[in-house]
């Protein structure tokens, strides 16, 4: 018989991720799994027992290829002819964290549970955040997979790769 976790038994942890040089989609998949609680053995699709995620330096996230200028996000005002489009470049000028928030939001369920889970995502464009009292565990996104960080095209690697001697 399958055992379900009760609300009293749910413990939420806090995680901190530095988004400097991280690829948007790869970062969003890691974050959405943590927010949904898929990293726990007690995962149940209809319950919210995910963890909180604090993302700092979100203004330094990257897209691969030319998606930063060419990708388009669409929305509709509700009026006839009211479809609007915006590129990630223009959206990040107005709201730096909105690009990552949209990517994570689209990976969550679309109902009330997804909205509740999205409130566990805290995005900050600088180095500082007000959640240091929760003692978040640090997740180094570059050490999970070497494709999670954008390298420059001239062969120089970030310090994460030279310390671990990962070859490409």
Enumerate the predicted regions with their spans.
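Ribosome large-subunit tunnel/peptidyl-transferase-proximal elements
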Residues: 1-102, 108, 112, 130-168
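C-terminal structural segments of small proteins and small subunits
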Residues: 108-124
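Short, highly charged C-terminal tails/helix-capping segments
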Residues: 123-131
């Amino acid at each position: 018989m399958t055992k379900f976790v009760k609300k009293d038994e749910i413990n939420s942890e806090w995680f901190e991720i530095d988004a400097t040089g991280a690829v948007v989609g790869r970062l969003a998949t890691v974050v959405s799994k943590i927010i949904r609680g898929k990293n726990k053995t007690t995962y149940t699709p209809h319950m919210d027992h995910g963890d909180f995620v604090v993302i700092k330096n979100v203004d330094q996230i990257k897209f691969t290829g030319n998606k930063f200028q060419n990708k388009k996000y669409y929305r509709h005002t509700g009026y006839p002819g009211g479809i609007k489009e915006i590129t990630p470049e223009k959206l990040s000028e107005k709201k730096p964290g909105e690009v990552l928030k949209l990517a994570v939001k689209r990976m969550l369920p679309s109902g009330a549970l997804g909205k509740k889970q999205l409130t566990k995502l805290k995005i900050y464009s600088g180095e500082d955040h007000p959640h240091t009292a929760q003692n978040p565990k640090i997740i180094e996104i570059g050490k999970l997979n070497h494709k999670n960080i954008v390298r420059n095209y001239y062969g120089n690697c970030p310090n994460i790769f030279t310390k671990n001697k990962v070859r490409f």
